Every structure is written in C-alpha cells, then in structure tokens.
C-alpha cells in the first residue's frame, strides 16, 4: 500500500519479558536506535505504566495494550498516553450495580487482591463503587503476585464476618 497519509510505516518489535525494567530497556532501544515515534503494547499493567512513563519523557506516543490499571493513563494524566481497553474504574462502575442487583445492598465484602498496580486499582475501584451502593468492606488483603496456593487466606476470610469474597 501507500502507507499512512502517503508515508511509509515500518515497525520493530521488542520483548518486555513481562518485567518493567526489560520493557523500559526495549522501548528505549526502539526510541533511540530505531527512531520510534509511537509505541504500543504493555501486556501487563506494570509494564505499561513503566513504558508509558518513558514515552512521556521522550515525547513519544504510547498506545497501551492489555492493561487494566487506572494508573496506565489516569494517574499522571500524560498528553501522549492512550488506551483502547477499559480500565479498573470502568470495571468497578459496571460491576457494582450488577452485584447489588443480584446480591443486595447490605453486604460485607472481603477483598483478596493481586499485589501490583492492576490489583491495587481494581481493589480501589470496586471498593469505591460497592461502598457507594451501601456495601461495607471488612478487609482488603494483598496476595503475592504469582501465588498459586491461596489456602492460607481462606481461614481469615471465613472468620472475618464477610458474606462476599471479591
């Protein structure tokens, strides 16, 4: 084809390894070595937040990929950062009325949250939205990223007085 607006478009790829430092290094190489004027990607919220910050420093457009954290585009309100997926705030706002409709307004919730930026903003968004509809948050506990066995968290949930686990 003729490119975009008559200009040839070329692309390069990099590997984030789903690690913030590796993602920043890869993005920096694309900007400095390859002359990238736009970067897209970020398959995790931590990666996207890190690359977003670098792109803002470099004046390069960043189009966030699969990142759900509010912090990707909302926290620092940067001019060059965009997303094409929904965020945690939207999830909380959409989920709370459904939970309330199906479970009632007088609930006590216990939150188990993945301990990184997506989990933190998801927890905050759901708590704000459900408490706005009358729910009470009994506890919010952060679980180690990558944990596969959550059995240690079950007894505290059962003893908390909560009637909903989020």
Residue ranges and their predicted role:
Residues 1-11, 131-135:
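Signal peptide-proximal N-terminal region
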Residues 10, 107-108, 163-164:
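Residues that mark the start of a beta-strand
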Residues 10-20, 113-117:
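Subtilisin-like peptidase catalytic core
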Residues 11-13, 139-142:
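A structural preference for short, hydrophobic beta-strand core positions in alpha/beta folds
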Residues 13, 20-37, 100-102, 149-161:
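Short, well-structured alpha-helical segments in soluble
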Residues 33-141:
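Extracytoplasmic ligand/sensor domains, especially the bilobed periplasmic-binding protein
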Residues 45-56, 149, 155, 160-166:
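Hydrophobic alpha-helical
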């Amino acid at each position: 084809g003729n490119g975009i607006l008559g200009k040839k478009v070329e692309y390069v790829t990099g590997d984030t390894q789903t690690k913030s430092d590796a993602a920043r290094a890869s993005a920096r190489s694309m900007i400095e070595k390859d002359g990238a004027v736009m970067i897209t990607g970020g398959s995790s919220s931590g990666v996207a937040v890190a690359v977003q910050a670098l792109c803002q420093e470099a004046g390069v457009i960043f189009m966030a990929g699969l990142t759900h954290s509010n912090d990707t585009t909302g926290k620092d309100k940067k001019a060059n950062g965009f997303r094409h997926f929904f965020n945690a705030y939207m999830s909380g706002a959409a989920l709370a009325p459904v939970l309330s409709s199906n479970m009632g307004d007088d609930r006590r919730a216990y939150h188990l949250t993945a301990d990184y930026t997506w989990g933190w903003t998801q927890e905050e968004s759901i708590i704000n939205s459900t408490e706005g509809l009358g729910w009470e948050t009994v506890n919010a506990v952060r679980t180690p990223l990558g944990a596969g066995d959550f059995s240690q968290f079950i007894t505290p949930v059962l003893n908390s007085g909560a009637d909903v686990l989020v």
